[in-house]
Amino acid sequence: MLKKAAIFGLAGVMAVAAGCGSNKDAGNANSNEAKIALLTTTTGGAAAYGESIKAGAELAVSEINADANAVKINLLVEDTKGDKNEAINAMNKVIAKDKVVAVIGPMLSGEMMAAGPVANKSKVVALGTSTTAEGITDIGDYIFRNAVPESLAVDTAIKEAHKTLGFKTAAIMYSNNNDQMVSVNNTARKALESVGVQIVDTETFADKDTDFSAQLTKIQQAKPDVIIVASLYQEGALIMKKMREMGMNQPVVGSNGFNSPQFIKIAGDAANGVIVGTPWFPNKEDQKVKDFRKAYVAKYGKEPDQFAAQAYDAVYLYEAALKKAGSTTDREKFREALKNIADFVGVTG
């Protein structure tokens, strides 16, 4: 069972940098329909996140387009493959060739760090639904997110876990070629130090690694009370399985990457004892959440996860901004409208 240690809502989380500037309209033969690009990862090691994001976004679009009072959306999906160069190429394509009014994505923090400047320079809004690393919204005035940053999620998860478990020592294990996980390491160190926890070991690995024996042996020798793991779901699940196989039964605080059903599917019983912060609570007594779950299950035959929920919210947030802007093509009006939305409530909060 995956334990949820902290509750987060989106209110006040979406960081917005104020600014101004002229901009060209997005080209669109049908002025009653807005072209929105979704840059996500549907192939590669992070595909489970991307498939959920795509599913959540497409469900929202289908609902919006069936509503006579809504602004119609034409969603153009690009697979970035979890690769920074692919993300840059996709961003250039949807802005210059497809002439979208705005972009959702890219999916990974590293992709946004690479492709976000392209959108910002072109004065096209790009909103990340799962870009949780530090510095995302510092890219520029056109970069937004509705993802809970690791600086909040991991910090709170560690501090709440410390209140309950009272651990005195910790080890950190993170992917050092992943911008998001490097960010988690920085946040985790600050959070642990702030509550007087001694960090007895830090180990690194790379995305797509499959053998973690050497790192875990060193951590085992350090005998920490708790282990912080920052990884995507595949690596995280393999780390958990190897830990339990080695007799390491310490509680684990995981990064946002653990918030995928695939993590539990791969890790199995080894996922027991994991603590992770999430903005998504499917059992919340809220009609929007109930309706979303019902529609998602009816369309896809499975329950939505956090990534689907955040993408679903992003599309509805964009529709609200389009309506407020009064245009389906004016990129600058869209940005101003999005920046000034203060009362949006979605399925994640």
What are these regions (language model features)?
Residues 24-26, 49-53, 63, 67-135, ...:
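Beta-alpha junction/loop-to-helix N-cap segments that form part of ligand/metal-binding clefts
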Residues 243-312, 324:
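Extracellular/periplasmic periplasmic-binding protein-like sensory domains
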